[in-house]
Amino acid sequence: MDIFYNLIKCLIFSTYWLLIANITFRVLIKRRNIPYSMSWLLTIYIIPFIGISIWFFFGELYLGKRQKKIANRIWSISNKWLHELKSCTYIFQIKNSEVATSIFQLCKNRQGLHGIKSKKIKLLTNTKKIMQILIRDIYLARKNIEMVFYIWKPGGMADDVAIALIDSAKRGIHCRLMLDSAGSIEFFQSPWVEIMRKSGIQVVEALKVNLLRVFLRRVDVRQHRKIILIDNYIAYSGSMNLVDPYLFKKSSEIGQWIDLMTRIEGPIATTMGIIYSCDWEIETGLKILPQLPNKKMLENQSNKNASIQVIASGPGFLKNMIHQALLTAIYSAKRELIITTPYLVPSEDLLEAICTAAQRGVEVSIIIPLYNDSILVKWASRVFFSELLEAGVKIFQFQKGLLHSKSILVDQQLSLIGTVNLDMRSLWLNFEITLVIDDSDFGRNLFCIQNKYISDSQLIDKKAWSMRAYWKRILEKIFYFLSPLL
């Protein structure tokens, strides 16, 4: 009996140290920043059994075996389609403003495409109005409607959109709906799934959460994009999930979610369509390449000087592209930089870029919500305040709800709008999308919106912040240690 007991104990001990050695090796061979690597190593050594479990859930960036195989071959096939798109020279805007030149060169060199022209481009800030415009566009659709969202929560205005989709599918419009499994769990547990499928809508549950497969696929890689495509001509993207803001997370008592969406008419829908096609193929194995744009798309063009790039991230997409674009945009600022983000846990490079911008004379403002739905992110964000304030950055805390908008405005000319939060999950893990827009009219509109956010915010006083309670500083340091893992 003692021999058997000692054998089991020896086996457990050996397995434990083999796991520790394996994880240590995996962390060290990855070219990640030092704080990220140190956080993981300290986690598995200080809280070993829990740390090992956390690693298998969240440590490696990988998809399921079938999805990974599809993702690896996606761009080789899509590149053929992109080569055909390049022949449509009439959709490209070759010239850019001075402040946007660097980021558009980055996009051109890495993605292979110049900026895209647009017929109309509009910023939308009122969720009720956004839903009304969207429902109108759905009913006016002639060929196809494609959507992807992180969260679709049944109830209120979201049900109105669902009914519009069902009615459109019944009249012969080809409708595809892709929703993240974790974010839209309430939707997939509701009758809407069956109702939609019976009407002819193709509904796909993206990145299915399956606890039996946690050792085969990372569970916190999420489909975080928000895209709506109609007739290969109208495109929506931004921070808004398909939820009624008057009903969403009311119990959290943080107030209404404040979002920002962009509605664009023109060939940019084609570029966003190839991203949707890749996502759809990863989930279903089926390729649905969009049609090439025609010249009629740009007739009566109202934004003749506007240029747009679309940047996508996630497994199978260009590595570090969004992170590089953010850095390039920040370093391009000469006069003013305004950043709006609900979650502020930047990488060391982004933190350095923001501080450097302020130190070279750029007026830098960061707008974040005073109230947050994530206690972890709330405290992790606070640890960066001192360094930012010391560099001369103005930090505004929005008081009228959860500011969920994600935007960057450089010199009132270059705008970045999309789904990316300034945290590790958005920058390195999730499927995200960012629109890069070079247009002074659009920039002025975004500037007005951001100024409205600022007027509804309180400015953090540098002196008062330096006198905050000692226990708060301790909590901040604890969450700073965890920040690379968030």
Curated annotation (Swiss-Prot):
Residue intervals of the PLD phosphodiesterase domain: 219-246, 399-426
Record InterPro entries: Cardiolipin_synthase, CL_synthase_A, CLS_N, PLD-like_dom, PLipase_D/transphosphatidylase
Subcellular location(s) of the protein: Cell inner membrane
Pfam families (UniProt xref): PLDc_2 (PF13091), PLDc_N (PF13396)
Catalyzed reactions per annotation: 2 a 1,2-diacyl-sn-glycero-3-phospho-(1'-sn-glycerol) = a cardiolipin + glycerol
E.C. no: 2.7.8.-
SUPFAM superfamilies: Phospholipase D/nuclease
GO biological process, one term: cardiolipin biosynthetic process
CDD domains per UniProt: PLDc_EcCLS_like_1, PLDc_EcCLS_like_2
Molecular function, one GO term: cardiolipin synthase activity
Membrane topology of the entry: Multi-pass membrane protein
Annotated transmembrane regions: 3-23, 38-58
Enzyme class: transferase
Record carries keyword Cell membrane: yes
Keyword field contains Transferase: yes
Active site: 224, 226, 231, 404, 406, 411
NCBIfam families the UniProt entry points to: bac_cardiolipin
Family: Belongs to the phospholipase D family. Cardiolipin synthase subfamily. ClsA sub-subfamily.
Role played: Catalyzes the reversible phosphatidyl group transfer from one phosphatidylglycerol molecule to another to form cardiolipin (CL) (diphosphatidylglycerol) and glycerol.
Record PANTHER family: CARDIOLIPIN SYNTHASE, PHOSPHOLIPASE D
Protein name: Cardiolipin synthase A
Organism: Buchnera aphidicola subsp. Acyrthosiphon pisum (strain APS) (Acyrthosiphon pisum symbiotic bacterium)
